[in-house]
Amino acid sequence: HKKQEPESGFLYVVGTPIGNLSDISIRALNILENVSFIACEDTRQTQKLIKRYGINNKLVSFNKHNSFKKVPNLINFLKSGESIALVSDAGMPSICDPGEELIKEAKFVGLNIICIPGPCAAITALVSSGLPSSKFIFEGFLPKKKSEREKTLLEISRNNRTTILFESPTRLKKLLNEL
């Protein structure tokens, strides 16, 4: 006998498409439609996704600018029995986004967390690169400060594993020139 999802008081960490809105699971869509509300990085981005699939659920902004204030409120909603879907603008929440703090706090206070897997930009880049993928390192975003960035790049150059990192489109050209 399978439990019906979503369950009350659960935090659902839901992977979202990273480029093609069709890259989402039926289970993820069911969760997004049936949780109490969706905590999302940018409501405009998430609105595009849920509108595409005819989902009419409340969106709550949860991003790097407001996460410090919102984590306690979201934890209280979960404790009161609400079910929440946490989504990122693209890919898996918590990978270089504020979802990490909510998940950490929910774990700390003993709440139930279920991950609904989905696309991950880092792994997608790795498997399509043709580079060795059995052992790799994920660095996330490089530091913005040049001296710290150079130090990190030097450390990366000393390992013999494929390294994945994120960089914003606006800083990518500058980074490539530094390399």
How should these model regions be labeled?
Residues 32-38, 111-113, 162-163:
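Short active-site oxyanion
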Residues 9-11, 80-85, 161-162:
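Loop/turn-to-beta-strand initiation segments
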Residues 80-139:
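Short glycine-cluster motifs
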Residues 8-9, 120-179:
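Beta-strand/loop-alpha-helix module characteristic of Rossmann-like adenine-cofactor folds
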Residues 64-79, 98:
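Short phosphate-binding loop-to-helix
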Residues 1-65:
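Glycine-rich, flexible N-terminal cofactor/catalytic loop recognition
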Residues 18-21, 89-93, 169-171:
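Short glycine-rich anion-binding loops that position phosphate/pyrophosphate groups of nucleotides
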Residues 61-68, 141-145:
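Conserved helicase motor
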